[in-house]
C-alpha cells in the first residue's frame, strides 16, 4: 500500500481512530510505523500496569472501609491526563531502540526481572562484541530509568487530578464496585489519600530537584486556577455588553504575554511566589511566533505548565529531553484541551459561565461563523506545531498521538459550523 492509498483509508470514518492516525502518519511521512505501533502497545501495557499497582492499595483501603473482601472491590478513575507521560515514555523507548545494537530490543523484557538475562551475546561464537554488549546494557538501563520516572510521573498526575476533582466537587470520574455504603465522595477521599502516600514514597528515591520541579508546576497551575473567578466575572460582564470586559478578555485571556507589564501577573506567569532558581521558564521555552499563539499564556497556565513540569521531573532525574520535544507535548495537550474538551463542553461552559478559548471566541467574534473559524484555526496552530516538533525530535509516536487528537475532535457541534 502506497502513501496515497493510506491517505484515502485515513479518511474512512468507519476505521478505528488510532488506525486512521497511523495511516495518516504514513501518508505524510512515507514511513509505515510498525515498530512505533509495537512500542505504543508496550507503553500502554506498562502504564496500565503502573495504574493497576497504584490502585491495588486503593481497593484494599476501600474494602476496609466497607468491611468486605478486597477481591470483591474494583476501583477505576477516568482521566486522559496520562497521555503526555505515555508519549514521553514512547519517545524514550524509541531513543533506546535506536541507540541499541542491531537485532537487540531493549524494551522487550519482563518489567520486574533483570533485563540482562535476555541480552544476546553479540559477535562471533568465540569472540563476543564487547562494545555492542555494553551499548545494550546502557540502553536497557536507560529504559529502566525511563520506566521508573514514568511510574512516579503517572502516579503524581493521577494524585493531582484527583485532588483538583475533589476541590471542584466533581466525582463522576471516580467509580467503585463491590463496596456498599462507600459513596463517590468518600471513594475519592480514600483514593487521593492512598495515592498521595504512594507519591511521597516514590519521591524518596529521587533527588530533591525532582520534587521541586513537580511542586513548582503545581504551584503555578494552582495560581492560574485562583484566577478562575476573575475570568468568570469578565465573561459574565462581557455577555451583558461590557466593552471593558470584552477588551480584558481579548488582551489578558487571548493575547496575554509571558513578559512585560501585566497587572495580574508577576511578569512571567500568574500570581505565584517567586522561585529562587525556577526550572519552568515559558518565556524562554516558546520561540519564533509561538508567543503570539492565541490563548497561549492562559492555556499554558491551565494545562501546559503541568507537563512542562513533568518534563523537568525527567530531567531532574537524569534523563535528557529536548526542548523541542517539550514543546511538542505542551502544544499537544493545549490543542487537545481545546479540540476535545472545550469544544465538547461548549454548551455546558456557556451555561456555567466558564471562560475557555471556545466561549471566549463566541464573545469576541462578530459572527458565529467567524468564531468557529477562529477556534479551528487556533487549535490547528497548536497541533501543527506539535507535529513539527515531534518530527524534529524523531518521535513518531508523539506525531501519531497529535494526529489522533485531531481526528478525535468534532468541531461540527459548534455554532457557525455551516452557514
Label for each model-derived stretch:
Residues 1-21:
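Intrinsically disordered, low-structural-confidence terminal and linker regions
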Residues 34-88, 192-264, 270:
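N-terminal, motif-rich segments that launch catalysis or mediate targeting to/interaction with membranes
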Residues 175-204, 287-301, 327, 350-391:
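Divalent-cation-assisted or electrostatically stabilized phosphate/pyrophosphate-binding catalytic cores
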Residues 194-233, 305, 365-408:
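Primarily interfacial, aromatic-capped hydrophobic alpha-helices that serve as membrane anchors
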Amino acid at each position: 500500500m502506497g502513501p496515497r492509498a493510506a491517505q484515502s483509508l485515513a479518511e474512512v470514518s468507519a476505521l478505528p481512530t488510532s488506525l486512521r492516525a497511523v495511516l495518516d502518519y504514513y501518508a505524510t511521512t512515507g514511513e509505515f510505523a510498525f515498530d512505533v505501533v509495537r512500542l505504543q502497545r508496550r507503553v500502554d501495557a506498562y502504564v496500565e500496569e503502573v495504574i493497576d499497582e497504584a490502585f491495588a492499595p486503593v481497593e484494599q483501603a476501600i474494602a476496609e472501609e466497607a468491611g468486605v473482601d478486597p477481591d470483591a472491590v474494583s476501583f477505576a478513575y477516568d482521566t486522559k491526563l496520562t497521555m503526555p507521560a505515555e508519549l514521553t515514555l514512547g519517545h524514550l523507548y524509541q531513543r533506546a531502540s535506536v541507540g541499541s545494537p542491531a537485532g537487540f530490543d531493549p524494551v522487550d523484557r519482563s518489567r520486574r526481572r533483570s533485563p540482562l538475562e535476555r541480552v544476546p551475546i553479540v559477535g562471533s561464537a568465540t569472540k563476543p562484541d564487547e562494545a555492542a554488549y555494553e551499548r545494550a546494557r546502557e540502553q536497557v538501563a536507560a529504559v529502566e530509568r525511563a520506566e521508573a520516572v514514568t511510574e512516579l510521573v503517572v502516579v503524581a498526575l493521577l494524585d493531582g487530578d484527583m485532588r483538583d476533582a475533589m476541590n471542584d466537587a466533581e466525582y463522576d470520574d471516580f467509580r467503585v464496585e463491590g463496596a456498599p455504603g462507600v459513596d463517590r465522595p468518600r471513594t475519592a477521599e480514600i483514593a487521593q489519600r492512598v495515592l498521595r502516600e504512594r507519591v511521597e514514597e516514590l519521591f524518596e528515591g529521587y533527588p530533591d530537584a525532582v520534587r521541586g520541579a513537580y511542586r513548582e508546576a503545581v504551584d503555578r497551575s494552582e495560581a492560574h486556577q485562583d484566577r478562575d473567578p476573575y475570568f468568570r466575572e469578565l465573561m459574565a460582564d462581557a455577555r451583558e455588553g461590557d466593552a471593558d470586559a470584552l477588551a480584558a478578555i481579548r488582551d489578558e485571556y487571548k493575547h496575554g504575554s509571558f513578559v512585560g507589564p501585566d497587572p495580574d501577573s508577576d511578569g512571567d506567569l500568574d500570581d505565584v511566589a517567586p522561585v529562587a532558581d525556577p526550572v519552568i521558564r515559558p518565556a524562554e521555552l516558546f520561540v519564533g511566533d509561538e508567543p503570539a499563539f492565541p490563548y497561549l499564556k492562559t492555556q499554558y497556565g491551565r494545562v501546559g505548565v503541568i507537563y512542562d513540569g513533568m518534563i523537568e521531573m525527567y530531567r531532574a532525574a537524569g534523563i535528557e529531553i529536548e526542548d523541542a520535544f517539550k514543546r511538542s507535548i505542551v502544544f499537544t495537550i493545549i490543542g487537545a484541551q481545546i479540540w476535545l474538551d472545550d469544544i465538547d463542553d461548549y454548551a455546558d461552559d456557556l451555561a456555567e459561565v466558564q471562560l475557555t478559548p471556545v466561549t471566549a471566541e463566541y464573545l469576541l467574534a462578530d459572527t458565529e461563523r467567524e468564531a468557529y473559524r477562529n477556534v479551528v484555526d487556533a487549535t490547528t496552530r497548536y497541533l501543527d506545531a506539535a507535529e513539527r516538533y515531534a518530527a524534529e525530535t524523531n518521535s513518531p509516536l508523539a506525531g501519531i498521538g497529535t494526529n489522533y487528537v485531531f481526528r478525535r475532535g468534532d468541531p461540527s457541534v459548534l455554532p457557525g459550523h455551516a452557514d
